[in-house]
Amino acid sequence: DMLANVTMNMGGLASDVEDSPFQNWSMILFPYATGDFHSGTGEFRYTDTDGKEKILYHNGYTNYTLAMKKIMEKAGIENADTVLVTGYSAGGWGASILADDIYTNYFPNATNKNVFVDSSMALYDKWYDTAVNVWQSPSSITSKIKTDNLTMDMLRALREKYGDSIHL
């Protein structure tokens, strides 16, 4: 993805520029999102407008988990001290939704935890219903959904869990 390459390698976040404030940080970047914001684990059956039975496959969380296991095996970053979980455009939803999972399961010893969400805000009264019944997201995700603002719910839950030890 060209935009991810520019962001990470050409003067962006993980730049080799001497004065980069992000030098030596480990980063998890979500450049975009799956239809379930990387949080689904199941199938949703429905009938389309022509009366045909259809299935939506929501495997974002399953795929994310497999990818993270492979990344952790290959990258040698399991002892990272400073970590940034970030996403832009629809990837910001993935960053906000999965940051707790990332810090709990992959970087539990990081002392400098950071989450930066860019451009992922949408008000929708049925986030909880969608996450539970359509995407079949894990309860570790759905239990944090309290309002019509999914991103803010996730960020609030991070603040409640980590307090001042996480930078949002």
Where are these regions (language model features)?
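Short, flexible loop/turn elements at secondary-structure junctions
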Residues: 29-34, 87-90, 119-121
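Glycine-rich nucleophile elbow surrounding the catalytic serine of serine-hydrolase chemistry
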Residues: 88-99
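Flexible loop/turn segments at secondary-structure boundaries
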Residues: 36-38, 92-94, 122-126
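Surface cap/lid and interfacial helix-loop subdomains adjacent to catalytic sites
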Residues: 43-44, 54-84, 99-168
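Functionally engaged cysteine thiol sites
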Residues: 1-2, 33, 77, 89, ...
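Active-site machinery of serine-nucleophile hydrolases
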Residues: 1-75
